[in-house]
Amino acid sequence: MRVSRLMLVTLRDIPADAEIASHQLLLRGGYIRRVTSGIYAYLPLMWRVLRKITSIVQEEMDATGALETLLPQLQPAELWRRSGRWQGYTAGEGLMFHLEDRQGRELGLGPTHEEVITSLAGDLLRSYRQLPVTLYQIQSKFRDEIRPRFGLMRGREFIMKDAYSFHSCEADLAMTYRAMDEAYQRIFSRCGLETVAVEADSGAIGGASSQEFMVTADAGEDLILISGDGHYAANQEKAVSHPPKAIPLPASKVALLDTPEQGTIETLCTAQGLVPSQVVKVLVMLARFEDGELQPVLVSIRGDQQLNEVKLINALSRELNKGVLDVAPISADQITAQKLEAWPFGAIGPDLDDALLSGATSWTKHFLRLADPTATELNCFVCGANQNNQHRTGMTWSKLGGVPKSVDLRKSQAGDRCIHDSSQILEERRGIEVGHIFQLGRKYSEALEACFTNDQGTQEPFWMGCYGIGISRLAQAAVEQHHDEAGMKWPLAIAPFEVIIVVANIQDEVQQKLAEQLYSELQAADIEALLDDRTERAGVKFKDADLIGIPWRVVVGRDAAKGQVELIQRSSRKVQILSAKQAFTALVKDIAANQNTRV
């Protein structure tokens, strides 16, 4: 390919809406172009990258025995209603684009395909003899993101590989889950990425257990916590740990404390000579359920700890056996809208009276009370007195009428001691999620009544797994992990081209002839070469070559008359002066050795 025919348009200035390096470089390098918020065109260079990633993914999926297919992007609402996910994905801040056809039938643009694939499996897989089966597809998905950002990292249209497996028993599902784990690690390694596999929350997909694959990068949206010995890693949403030990509050009689303008843990502790671990703080949350119920929740947690809202959502879902759309703090304006008397915010205790909800217009008229073990394990503590500007000291749970249901709700932090070995300390890293695998169990097969006949002749629901990789996100994550101040540094296996030949002066006949000769030889050797034959100044070509990040650069310049060229490796910036023949030999050897083909 010749640059003059590539439609390469590079930018010198950083686009105003690009916040992170990878987004900036992909725009500046002419790889992508914004069409509208969260939607991008993949230009020729980017499409070559995406095709290479896709090829690696297909090879590794095929090697597991998975079968490639293609499912419809438009999905009927009826299937999603049967699984119980339509309301959660479309109401309020739901992420599914949805529409009505000419007959008034509701449809959704697929952000994921559990419902469709489960319905198909129920029709096609009738006997245990047909199992296990894994189907996968690579296609565009859609999410109506509230705040699209970071280019392809959080867009509204993106390319994804999603696979779904069907099994006759849980043990067989576990085997495929492990096989997918290994396949994913090979995929990311072949793509030249450093990744960490971490325990993860299953989120809206659901299921018994899941694991994310994170590309480590400073700009990562996710916080991951890793033990020093490497034996534990988890997304912060899922992480568990030992909290710091509390400093005991000396036992004393219950007494009221006047606490004006002490409505936060910090101001309370400063004024009263306390430390945060001696205080039980109470968070008043509103849970919104898929069935429309609005449930006020009192969460008690030690004063030095933070609430993990994902853990709270999961706890509520387990406690009430129904889906939770979201949780959020209750505000004074919401209380007014419910026609309730004002609550003593900043001084609320675990025993806040249910009577405060008696006149609520749309909320459940009692509090659901939960407490984190950091709070329930305190023998004596300070808490709100349920009166403005009043707290109580010397409190115990028995004096409050009993301990609320205890469940892990705290947010693990760097510096916490590890569960598996209390001598190990959690360390913090940032990560970009590029893959996620789930053991779904029977959540979808039961909801959609997708069954097979087992070896006893009776019907039972499939055991299922699902396995996703963000193809377009992976491409940008590679740039985030491999770049410098001058531009991208693509790993060889997914680079749009393997070599770029830069002719310093295209008007020089000797330079042009040597470049054309080397270009032809590289093509004949099945090396993907890009020839910069533009009439631009040499400096412009060199800057563009650095920016677009081709792994190897050959500069044909003033030494062309002597048959010599410069060979430059993009990743290391190492420069060698070689004859054209030596450069050709070195390129063939290195590229053959580093292709990252499947073994």
Swiss-Prot record:
Pfam families: HGTP_anticodon, tRNA-synt_2b, tRNA_edit. It is an enzyme of class 6 (ligase). It is found in: Cytoplasm. It catalyses: tRNA(Pro) + L-proline + ATP = L-prolyl-tRNA(Pro) + AMP + diphosphate. Disulfide bonds: none annotated. It comes from the Bacteria. Its EC number is 6.1.1.15. SUPFAM superfamilies: Class II aaRS ABD-related, Class II aaRS and biotin synthetases, YbaK/ProRS associated domain. GO terms for cellular component: cytosol. PROSITE patterns: AA_TRNA_LIGASE_II. Homodimer. Consists of three domains: the N-terminal catalytic domain, the editing domain and the C-terminal anticodon-binding domain. Belongs to the class-II aminoacyl-tRNA synthetase family. ProS type 1 subfamily. NCBIfam families: PRK09194.1, proS_fam_II. This is Proline--tRNA ligase. The gene is proS.
